[in-house]
Design a protein with these regions (language model features):
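Short, well-ordered alpha-helical segments enriched in acidic and aromatic residues
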Residues: 65-90
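Bacterial N-terminal signal peptides that target proteins for export
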Residues: 2-14
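Short, low-complexity N-terminal intrinsically disordered segments enriched in polar/charged residues
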Residues: 25-63, 71
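C-terminal motif of bacterial Sec signal peptides marking the signal peptidase cleavage site
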Residues: 20-24
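Surface-exposed, charged secondary-structure patches
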Residues: 92-165
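Sec-exported extracytoplasmic/periplasmic mature domains
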Residues: 59-62, 74-78, 116-124
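Acidic/histidine-rich, surface-exposed loop or edge segments in extracytoplasmic proteins
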Residues: 31-41, 51-54, 81-100
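Short beta-strand edge/turn micro-motifs at domain boundaries
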Residues: 26-42, 149-208
């Protein structure tokens, strides 16, 4: 099956999963939350599907559980693969114009250092992370192969008590890796999709 055919098939499946998750876990909502959602118990990490890994990311950020969030990313020690992230060219240009030097690469240990600082950017409430398909960038493409590679192009929105923390579009590559063949994020291609709110990539560059 070609990547294009896989993409169409995966998008159809995703639409079904999206409907289930939207009604059950709120994963793909994009509206401003009415109030902080800090209540409820912690869910165990689940990496059986890309959607469950996304749900783990969402839940972990809301609960300020940086350990579980980082587990969603590939790690050389645990998975024998490294996570990498890239930045929107406009974010890199803006950062360089401020007289600072952008990092040559962004890997798991960088995200591990950054994430606690990201969570202090707005200390007034819990963070809510929402995803929705970015069809302009291709939606979902299923490349298959030994690692059952899938690329999800998603708009993301991070809110804290009704205030935006970060917004953008991410091309997230999921692959089955490690001893348990878990679906982890191996690559994050960050893009701007709004002029009014900083991207996750800009937050990474600024360290919070």
């Amino acid at each position: 099956m070609s990547p294009i055919v896989r993409r169409n098939f995966a998008a159809a499946v995703f639409a079904i999963v999206l409907g289930v998750c939207a009604s059950g876990c709120g994963l793909f909502k994009t509206q401003t939350p009415e109030s902080p959602t800090g209540g409820g118990g912690e869910l165990a990490p689940n990496f059986s599907l890309p959607e469950s890994t996304l749900a783990t990311m969402q839940r972990s950020l809301n609960k300020r559980n940086t350990t579980n969030f980082i587990l969603c990313l590939a790690d050389t020690l645990l998975d024998f693969r490294e996570f990498h992230a890239t930045f929107d060219p406009s974010d890199l240009t803006q950062f360089a114009q401020s007289g600072r030097i952008p990092p040559a690469d962004w890997i798991t240990k960088n995200e591990q250092t950054f994430l606690p600082q990201f969570l202090t950017y707005n200390t007034n409430g819990f963070y809510d992370l929402y995803f929705s398909l970015d069809t302009d960038r291709g939606g979902i493409t299923d490349y298959g192969g030994a690692t059952q590679k899938k690329v999800y192009n998603l708009h993301y929105r991070v809110w804290a008590v009704g205030s935006p923390v970060a917004a953008g579009s991410a091309g997230l590559t999921f692959e089955r890796i490690g001893a348990n063949s878990d679906y982890k994020v191996t690559f994050w291609e960050d893009h701007r999709d709004t002029a009014d709110v900083r991207t996750w990539g800009t937050a990474r560059l600024n360290g919070r």
